[in-house]
């Protein structure tokens, strides 16, 4: 009985030692993405982008820039305007963990039409953040 208890505690000791030596793969970090709610085409040459930064991570961070691929499609299915790699620099907006922060900005391009009819948009974004401001 004494030897089985010794083996058990030895095995438990090595299991705890290995667990402490190997770093956890689930480290705390921010996961921030920009989402678009609406695109408005009030004036020719300008698109108003209304959206939000969402942090689904477990640590807050500062947004530095977001890069967007945007396509605007008329109600009849015709592509009205498209561009990719539109980089918008942000002035250190802090996004706490598990929250949304509303954000609006403008894209200026001479090919953007003024349009008041129905249209939809397709987009993809890539957001860069850092843990420190500045």
Predicted regions and their residues:
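Bacterial N-terminal signal peptides that target proteins for export
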Residues: 2-12
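Bacterial N-terminal signal peptides
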Residues: 10-20
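Low-complexity, acidic Ser/Thr/Pro/Gly-rich terminal tails and inter-domain linkers that flank the onset
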Residues: 26-46, 52, 133-134
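Hydrophobic core residues within well-ordered beta-strands of beta-rich domains
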Residues: 47-49, 66, 101
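Asparagine-centered strand-capping/turn motif at beta-strand->loop junctions
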Residues: 53-58
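Short acidic, flexible loop segments centered on an aromatic residue
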Residues: 59-80
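Intrinsically disordered, low-complexity Pro/Gly/Ser/Thr-rich segments with frequent PxxP/GP/PP motifs
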Residues: 80-113
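Terminal connector regions
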Residues: 107-134
């Amino acid at each position: 009985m004494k030897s089985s208890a010794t083996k058990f505690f030895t095995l438990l000791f090595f299991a705890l030692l290995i667990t402490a030596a190997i770093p956890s793969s689930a480290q705390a970090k921010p996961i921030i993405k920009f989402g678009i709610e609406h695109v408005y085409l009030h004036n020719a040459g300008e698109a108003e982008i209304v959206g939000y930064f969402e942090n689904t991570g477990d640590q807050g961070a500062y947004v530095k820039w977001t890069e967007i691929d945007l396509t605007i499609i008329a109600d009849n299915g015709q592509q009205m305007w498209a561009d990719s790699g539109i980089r918008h620099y942000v002035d250190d907006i802090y996004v706490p963990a598990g929250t949304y922060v509303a954000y609006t900005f403008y894209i200026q391009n001479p090919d953007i039409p003024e349009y008041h009819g129905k249209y939809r948009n397709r987009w993809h974004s890539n957001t860069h953040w850092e843990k420190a401001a500045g």
